[in-house]
Amino acid sequence: MARKALIEKWNKTPKHSTRAYTRCRICGRPHAVLKKYGICRICFRELAYKGEIPGCKKASW
């Protein structure tokens, strides 16, 4: 239940725009969020390995 309450809280627009911050759309993690995709690095890595992010592949050099 606490998770549902937090999700509802994040979806509301804040009173002042400076209070808004990025959170992962999948797990809700507040840190290490990639703005381009809107997800955290951990979720990004999982989705990239599954091939669910188009145009993304593992780097090797």
Curated annotation (Swiss-Prot):
Keyword GTP-binding attributed: no
Chain sites annotated for binding Zn(2+): 24, 27, 40, 43
Gene Ontology CC terms, in alphabetical order: cytoplasm; small ribosomal subunit
MF terms (GO), sorted A to Z: rRNA binding; structural constituent of ribosome; zinc ion binding
SUPFAM superfamilies referenced in this protein's UniProt entry, alphabetically: Glucocorticoid receptor-like (DNA-binding domain)
Pfam families noted in UniProt: Ribosomal_S14 (PF00253)
Keyword terms of this UniProt record: Metal-binding, Ribonucleoprotein, Ribosomal protein, RNA-binding, rRNA-binding, Zinc
Domain of life, source organism: Bacteria
Cofactor names: Zn(2+)
Gene3D superfamilies: 30s Ribosomal Protein S14, Chain N
Cofactor note: Binds 1 zinc ion per subunit.
Presence of keyword Ribonucleoprotein: yes
GO biological process entries: translation
Matching InterPro entries: Ribosomal_uS14, Ribosomal_uS14_bact, Ribosomal_uS14_sf
PANTHER family: 30S RIBOSOMAL PROTEIN S14, SMALL RIBOSOMAL SUBUNIT PROTEIN US14M
Similarity section: Belongs to the universal ribosomal protein uS14 family. Zinc-binding uS14 subfamily.
Subunit structure: Part of the 30S ribosomal subunit. Contacts proteins S3 and S10.
Function of the molecule: Binds 16S rRNA, required for the assembly of 30S particles and may also be responsible for determining the conformation of the 16S rRNA at the A site.
Protein name: Small ribosomal subunit protein uS14
Source organism per UniProt: Clostridium botulinum (strain Hall / ATCC 3502 / NCTC 13319 / Type A)
Upper classification of the organism: Bacteria, Bacillati, Bacillota, Clostridia, Eubacteriales
Gene that encodes the chain: rpsZ
